[in-house]
Swiss-Prot record:
The lineage of its organism: Bacteria, Bacillati, Actinomycetota, Actinomycetes, Mycobacteriales. GO terms for molecular function: structural constituent of ribosome. Belongs to the bacterial ribosomal protein bS16 family. PANTHER family: 30S RIBOSOMAL PROTEIN S16, SMALL RIBOSOMAL SUBUNIT PROTEIN BS16M. Keywords: Ribonucleoprotein, Ribosomal protein. It holds the Pfam family Ribosomal_S16. This is Small ribosomal subunit protein bS16.
Length: 165
């Protein structure tokens, strides 16, 4: 009996999920299977590929022929290299980053809320008006300091004139 390792399609129209199965070569794509050895989800980022390496090695050793798609998956997981005795048996499988738990996200948001807002919640018009007001106040303060400095310079001259007289 000719045995193939092939993909059995599951899922809705635009969301395919596949099972990696061992089946007779003459059966339909979604027909009766001998054994289910893994899953493949191409729509996830990165793609989810889970294949039982031990069972894949067994079926390859007894002569099961993988389809082109399954052969590509076996190369990614490193099972094909292990079977052929080629270097690079670790494969090139990408692993998704673990999602942070909801409790961690909640605690992080809570700490950010306690620290206060990181950016000012002021519109551009109000911000510009406030900057103009601050600039006017700074100019008035500078003018007042200049006037006070000028008066203090004039005062010693008047005192010196009073002493001479």
């Amino acid at each position: 009996m000719a045995v193939k390792i092939k993909l059995q399609r599951l899922g809705k129209i635009r969301t395919p999920h596949y099972r990696v199965v061992i089946a007779d070569a003459r059966t339909k794509r979604d027909g009766k299977v001998i054994e289910n050895i893994g899953i493949y989800e191409p729509k996830a980022e990165p793609s989810v590929i889970k294949i039982n390496s031990e069972r894949a090695q067994h079926w390859l050793s007894v002569g099961a022929q993988p389809t082109e798609a399954v052969a590509a998956l076996l190369k990614v997981t490193g099972d094909w290299q292990k079977f052929k005795g080629i270097e690079g048996a670790e494969g090139t499988l990408r692993v998704a980053e673990p999602k942070p738990s909801k409790l961690e996200l909640f605690n992080q948001a809570l700490s950010e809320a306690n620290n206060g807002p990181t950016a000012e919640a002021i519109t551009e018009k109000k911000k510009k008006a406030r900057e103009d007001k601050e600039a006017k106040e700074a100019a008035e303060k500078a003018a007042a300091e200049k006037a006070a400095a000028a008066e203090s310079e004039e005062a010693p001259a008047e005192e010196a004139a009073a002493e001479e007289a």
